[in-house]
Swiss-Prot record:
E3 ubiquitin-protein ligase that catalyzes 'Lys-27', 'Lys-48'- or 'Lys-63'-linked polyubiquitin chains formation and plays a role in different biological processes such as modulation of immune response, cytoskeletal dynamics or protein homeostasis. Inhibits IL2 and IL4 transcription, thereby playing an important role in the induction of the anergic phenotype, a long-term stable state of T-lymphocyte unresponsiveness to antigenic stimulation associated with the blockade of interleukin production. It is found in: Cytoplasm; Endomembrane system; Cytoplasm, Cytoskeleton; Cytoplasm, Perinuclear region. It comes from Bos taurus (Bovine). Keywords: Cytoplasm, Cytoskeleton, Glycoprotein, Membrane, Metal-binding, Signal, Transferase, Transmembrane, Transmembrane helix, Ubl conjugation, Ubl conjugation pathway, Zinc, Zinc-finger. The gene is RNF128. Auto-ubiquitinated. Controls the development of T-cell clonal anergy by ubiquitination. This is E3 ubiquitin-protein ligase RNF128.
Length: 431
């Protein structure tokens, strides 16, 4: 088949993958004439066989309307006809000996001469030589074509022969049963004539084992791929649902915690409105009278409209990251179960508390938040009195230390401004 116009120019010009793929499809799907061969095309052959008994004038013609043979991969796709002639000798059916001869019938010619009729070599497959050797020998002996029948035991199975270098004459393969029947007729002295015509074109030639293997492999790969995607999708869906449930639960807990936080309306004279007053860390605006503010457990103050949406999503202070759920002792449900975080909201501190504990910030924030909640009442004297009562003596062999413990504060400077009467005193007594 000739090259499609412009195909070479496109490929030499660095064509894109999509354009090259389109050209390849055109090359594969383009129609082919019977005189040309596709790389994977298989052409069948229609056979018209006639039997003629010598000296009796009786002709027996059998029309074969089915696909009886297969053209070789290197054979010309042309019709051909002739008398079938097997190799001479009982052991020469394979035609592997280069000296093999064929006894070709003749017909009377002009001036009393005899002329060989057009004939086709009938050769059996096998014998230790290739298809090309058999076909080339038949061509050298003057045959118009070669008819090769399959091994014994293969019934009427045929394959597309590969015979490079031996494409001078038509070569087809027929089944063993068909070839044996013709051979037996010839051996009984019956002249057999065969007319070969081009049949139908078929796709790539594959045997039953290849089809079975490809089908099973495709099924396994498809099943594995579908199973993986089902498992992956189910896992993602389960994780998404669990995450959604967790987020909804956390938002519900955050709403509960926000409802327990203190609200206060700013009035003229509050320290947040004074000359040294701070601004809201969320909107960066100064506090004004009648502003509604939210006081968190860590004593940080924000506009209610600014901090409430933040707390719903993050549940922590925008400045110090103090967890309001832990500080208020609200139970937090997680995926594996329910964990209750109970944090005492009081001014008392255990004498053996480690400064490296993870919940120290929450306890500190809770203590400070309790002091802010009672800012409008007179609890400062009670705090100072309680702090003086929390004097403990800790003995460590040769050294002893007495510590005055006051309520924990998250921001000492802020607490000193709010309650200047409180002091933190640490006395170390060495014995």
């Amino acid at each position: 088949m000739g090259q499609l116009p412009g195909a070479g120019v496109f490929c030499r010009g660095g064509c894109g993958f999509s354009r090259l793929l389109a050209w390849c499809f055109l090359l594969v799907l383009s129609p082919q004439t019977p005189g040309s061969r596709g790389a994977e095309a298989v052409w069948t052959a229609y056979l018209n066989v006639s039997w003629r008994v010598p000296h009796t004038g009786v002709n027996r013609t059998v029309w074969e309307l089915s696909e009886e043979g297969v053209y070789g991969q290197d054979s010309p796709l042309e019709p051909v006809a002739g008398v079938l002639v097997p190799p001479d000798g009982p052991g020469a059916l394979n035609a592997c000996n280069p000296h093999t001869n064929f006894t070709v019938p003749t017909v009377p010619g002009d001036w009393g001469s005899s002329v060989q009729v057009s004939w086709l070599a009938l050769i059996q497959r096998g014998g230790g030589c290739t298809f090309a050797d058999k076909i080339h020998l038949a061509y050298e002996r003057g045959a118009s074509g070669a008819v090769i029948f399959n091994f014994p035991g293969t019934r009427n199975e045929v394959i597309p022969m590969s015979h490079p270098g031996a494409g001078d004459i038509v070569a087809i393969m027929i089944g063993n049963l068909k070839g044996t029947k013709i051979l037996q007729s010839i051996q009984r002295g019956i002249q057999v004539t065969m007319v070969i015509e081009v049949g139908k074109k078929h796709g790539p030639w594959v045997n039953h084992y290849s089809i079975f293997f490809v089908s099973v492999s495709f099924f396994i790969i498809t099943a594995a791929t579908v199973g993986y995607f089902i498992f992956y999708s189910a896992r993602r869906l389960r994780n998404a649902r669990a995450q959604s449930r967790k987020q909804r639960q956390l938002k519900a807990d955050a709403k509960k915690a926000i409802g327990r936080l203190q609200l206060r309306t700013q009035k003229q004279g509050d320290k947040e409105i004074g000359p040294d007053g701070d601004s809201c860390a969320v909107c960066i605006e100064l506090y004004k009278p009648n502003d509604l503010v939210r006081i968190l457990t860590c004593n940080h103050v924000f506009h209610k409209t600014c901090v409430d949406p933040w707390l719903l999503e993050h549940r922590t202070c925008p400045m110090c990251k103090c967890d309001i759920l832990k500080a208020l002792g609200i139970e937090v449900d997680v995926e594996d179960g329910s964990v209750s975080l109970q944090v005492p909201v009081s001014n008392e501190t255990s004498s053996n508390a480690s400064p490296h504990e993870e919940d120290n910030r929450s306890e500190t924030a809770s203590s400070g938040y309790a002091s802010v909640q009672g800012a409008d009442e007179p609890p400062l004297e009670e705090h100072a009195h309680s702090a003086n009562e929390n004097l403990q003596l800790v003995n460590h062999e040769a050294n002893s230390m007495a510590v005055d413990v006051v309520p924990h504060v998250d921001n000492p400077t802020f607490e000193e401004d709010e309650s200047p009467d409180q002091e933190t005193t640490v006395r170390e007594i060495k014995s």
